[in-house]
Amino acid sequence: MAAHALLSPSSAHRWLNCTASARLEAKVPDQSSSFAEEGTLAHAYCARGLKKFLGLPTDGEDKEIEELDRYHTGEMDECVEGYVAQVLGKYRSSLIKTHDARLLVEQRLDFGGYVPNAFGTADALIIADGLMEVIDFKYGKGVRVEAERNPQMMIYALGAYEEHSLEYSIERVRMTIVQPRLANISEYEIGIYDLLAWAENTLKPRAGMAYKGEGSQVPGDWCRFCRVRGMCKALAEDCLNTAERFSDPRLISPEMMAREVLPRLSAVKTWVGEVEEYALRQALEGQQYEGYKLVEGRSVRKVTDQDGLAAALSEDFSDDVIYKPRELRSITDLERLVGKKRFAEVGSPYISKPQGKPTLVPESDKRPPFNSAEMDFKDIEVK
């Protein structure tokens, strides 16, 4: 997606729910990060793998790989291989049913008929009679992404259908998100008429409001990646008013904890961090906050000349005293270096994984309920 596009498919979950957010975000420049660059590199490897299979040129991907290859790891290779295999498996299945099925890689799509001045690039499309496939690769592992009624995927599906519906008799769309670092392959299938009804009744009117900056600011889980979340008044009021929702300010019942408090914890914690970061950034740029001042934070001493310090200390102490013992890199680092599969092959006999610390999550979380010997045989006493 072009960086300057106002209503991008990747942020559709946000501007569909909070139509005011798009114009507010446009006032704040987007900042790149090492995570974004890492994802760009992984996408380039994915596209190059598929294009090589199709015999297509890979000049653009080669350039990106050359520029960003400092992020390349064995883990990335495994993720790319898994994605390419997934796409090609779907493509071969489509060819059995539609002999002229097409696999399109990094396909530019136009959905301006539904979202003003909007276009985007789909990672992979398989165009065939009957069932069309839309496949999206996500290298991030911070948030698990599901395909069910995912607006980004549905917008891509619309663009693909608009472009290819005259060539193929498309009746349904299967949308697949491949998120290998979370072992997540999520699929969702929808009929074309249902997709078009959603586009006319929901997407088009909400996108029109978002493009004009109309509507109220509506806080929700879509605030997570909003560029104005640290200064959004609606989100601030929502977080600050959380405690005031309780009928009894002295005690919180289990029912109230489940209904009012726990669902808000993640959003409130994230908001607090964002406000701190935003306020500090503004203060560094000269903004004055009454009752507050900038001071120098805690500093950690650093050795500027390790060889020189070691030589000075070696006059009185042996090497085994002044040097730390050699130690292995962390398991995560080793997996990234050699790849998860290879590391599991050679390293599993030497690694154990204890039971994880219990944590409260919504019922919708796909992990099994926590169970321990203590919970099986004794009541839990909370002090």
Indicate where each model-derived feature is located.
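DEDD superfamily 3′-5′ metal-dependent exonuclease/proofreading module
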Residues: 40, 49-50, 54, 59, ...
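Hydrophobic/aromatic-lined pockets within catalytic cores
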Residues: 50-54, 139-142, 157-165, 208-211, ...
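Alpha-helix N-cap/helix-initiation motif
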Residues: 31, 144-146, 254
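Extended, charge-rich alpha-helical segments
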Residues: 270-383
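Short, charged, low-complexity amphipathic alpha-helix
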Residues: 174, 196, 200-267, 368-383
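Mg2+/Mn2+-dependent nuclease catalytic core
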Residues: 37, 41, 99-208
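Short acidic (Asp/Glu) and glycine-rich catalytic loops that position anionic groups and cofactors
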Residues: 19-25, 135, 176-186, 227, ...
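Metal-dependent nuclease catalytic cores that hydrolyze phosphodiester bonds in DNA/RNA
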Residues: 1-132, 172-174, 186, 265
